[in-house]
Amino acid sequence: MKVEKIYHLADLHIRNYQRHDEYRKVFNKFLKNVERDGIENSVIYIAGDIAHAKTDMSPELVSEISWFLTECSKLREVVLITGNHDCNLNNSSRLDVLTPIVDNLNNKRIHYLKDTGVYNIHNLTFVVYSILDDKENWPTGDSISGENKICLFHGPVNKAQTDIGYTVSSDSFTTEIFDGFDMVLLGDIHKRQVLKESNPVIVYAGSTVQQNHGELLDGHGYLLWDVTSRTFTEHDLYNEYGYLTVDVDNGKIPNWVITESNSGKLPTKPRIRLRYSNTNKSEITKVITELKKLFNVVEVTVTRTDTVSKSNIGGLVN
């Protein structure tokens, strides 16, 4: 098979027992998209952090990861690498989360590329820069031959940005270490972004599912790469359980919340962070009541923003 397309996911962060219904719905949307596309000459690549709690594992976690990898493999071959949340980087004697799961599945269509190395899969030359190995052992792009040299890495690359405005500063992991490759498919930073547009193109897919209020509501899903052109398209996966921040001033809910509540753009079952200023307790109670009319609210946290101290309003969020 000549692979022409790559589905690029990253940073799933499946919990031990929380949010599994939410994740299952998002994953099913992805699987339906892959099936709908009907691109037989494609592979699915997951760029690390499939698990969330490092080596703290639960039976439910094993079940969810096994289910997702198996369902993906029914549609396409699957390639995955290790993320820092899939292992304990501080104790190399501990086994990572993914090895026993993949070994138990014993599925020839699932390729777990745990170690640094060159892996030829069909017409693709995958080069893994494993976080479990020393950087000195990573082969350079120029030292490798191949029609499509694709570097797979999970880690913070210099000048990458997060949704909260933090910029990575790293002398160890710069874009220059990827010189000589055609494409670099990254995981670790949860904000979808392009670090370099060509020679090579270097891209973070971002988190598949919004993790918390520190991440923007949109920009979560996957990328679909065209191997020949070295280009990609962005595909968001709608999540009805998203994290929504609502800023209330003078007791007023912003108009955009009201107008977009039924647009299909906002989550229908949100976790709401309500930040308020110039608003008293009774007005907050009214605002929460109105929000619960607009949405099937999962939870509400309340924070005051017009003073230095931040406080939760007891009894209002139940």
Which role fits each region the language model picked out?
Residues 8-10, 43-49, 77-84, 111-116, ...:
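Active-site neighborhood of phospho(di)ester-bond hydrolases with catalytic His/Asp-centered motifs
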Residues 65, 86-176, 205-207:
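Conserved catalytic scaffold of divalent metal-dependent phosphoesterases
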Residues 17-21, 50-68, 87-104, 163, ...:
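Metal-dependent catalytic neighborhoods of phosphoester/phosphodiester hydrolases
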Residues 2, 37-39, 227-318:
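Accessory, non-catalytic peripheral segments of nucleic-acid enzymes
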Residues 1-68, 140-147:
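N-terminal active-site segment of His-dependent metallophosphoesterases
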Residues 163-232:
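Conserved beta-sheet core of the metallophosphoesterase superfamily
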